Amino acid sequence: MTYTWLTVDCDDIRHIPKHHGHPTRTKSPVQSNNLSADFIQGMQGFETWLSSHNKPVTLFVIADSLQSQEFCDWLIDLLKNFADRLTIGCHGLDHKSWSAWPENSDLF
């Protein structure tokens, strides 16, 4: 195996600052935990891409994504199919833009 390390952040539209976690940029919060069509298309493309090579990959998941059964099922399948080279990391609970807020080490 070639030792190339790639990390991928796994953010849906509801996680971007326009919709969540930023004190001035969040204007239209998305209240649903349903996956967006764009995210589902990205999941399918990611899986196709993983099938095209043997390099190790780390996927950083926002923990609240696990509230979607569809996402959980997809992640479980990825881990079954690519267990030898896929690592899952946590990219936070809900993708708050910490650097945009006043310091709060207790909450952080």
Positions of PLM-derived features:
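Catalytic alpha-helical scaffold of carbohydrate-active enzymes acting on polysaccharides/glycoconjugates
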Residues: 1-108
